[in-house]
C-alpha cells in the first residue's frame, strides 16, 4: 500500500459528492496543487440549484515541452439501496485488502494517485519542461453539460494549448494495467414519435395504429448494417431503449408511438449520415414521424504515439504487463477534451465494481497506479 495515496483517496471518498455536488473535493485538491506552484482557476457553471464545480490548474515549466493534462471527475453516482451496502458508502472501509466506498474505483482512486504522483514528480523535478495541468469537474456522472465541455470552451477561448491528456477513468479489466482506452465510440440518441390516429380497438378501419405501422420499420432498423467498423472500432450499433404507446386502456388504439434509441458509432459514420439514413428508412415505410436528436459525443481516436508509448512503458515497468489499447465501452469526458487536444487516453484502476453496491478497489494497487502516472510524467516532462 502507499500511505499518501491511501490517505487522500479516503479523504475524497468521505466527501458525499453525489453528482453534481463536488462536496469540497476540488478545494482539497486545489490546496495541494497550489502548494506546488500551480495556477488555480475555479470555474463554476450552471444554475444555482444545480451548480457544477470545475477546476483548471496548471504548473508551467521552463523550456519547450508538451502540456500534459490529468483529467477526471469528483462527482460519483448515487449509492442505490443503502441497506445493501455492507458499510457506509461514504465511510472508507477496509476488508480483505480492499477499500470500499462510493468512488473507490470511479474515480477518486485515480484522482488521489494523480495528485500524489505530481507531488513526487515536482519534488524530484522542480524545474521541468512543458506544463502539467489538472482538469476536474463534478458533472461527469450527470448530464455533462456544465462540466468538462465548458472548461474546454474556456481553454479554447484563452488559446491554451493542450498536447496530451490522461483521463483517470477505471479502464483496467482484470488487473491494474491490462487496458488503456485510446478512443471511444460516438453516441447519438433519438426520440422517435410515429403519428397514427387514435380510435376504438373494435373499429381499426377508423384508426391508424402507430404500433402496427412502425413495427416493420423498427425491425429493419434493428437489422440494418450501418457500417463495417475498422481496425480500431466495431461496426456502428443501433439499439432501442424504451417504447411507449397507448393510454393504459385496453380498448383504445393509440394515436402515437414513442421510441427512444441510441447509436454507438465508429469513425466510419457521422451523426449527419446516420440521421439521414434513419429518416430515409422511415420515409420509405410511409411513416409520419418526427425525431428529437441528441448528440452525446463524436468518436475520437488517439493513434500510437508519444502519450501511448510513455503510458504503456510505465505500465510495463511497474506491473510487468503488456497493456492493450482498446476503444470499447461507453462515453467519457475524453470526447470533449479530444476536440482541443490531439492525444487523449484513459487509464485507471479495475472497473469491475463501478456504479455497484459495495464498490471497491484493491489497496495494493494504489502505489502502482501512482507510480504509473509518475513515470508517465517523467517520460514526457522531465
UniProtKB/Swiss-Prot annotation:
The keyword Amino-acid biosynthesis applies. It comes from the Bacteria. Its EC number is 3.5.1.18. Binds 2 Zn(2+) or Co(2+) ions per subunit. The active site is at residues 75, 140. One of its GO terms (biological process) is diaminopimelate biosynthetic process. This is Succinyl-diaminopimelate desuccinylase.
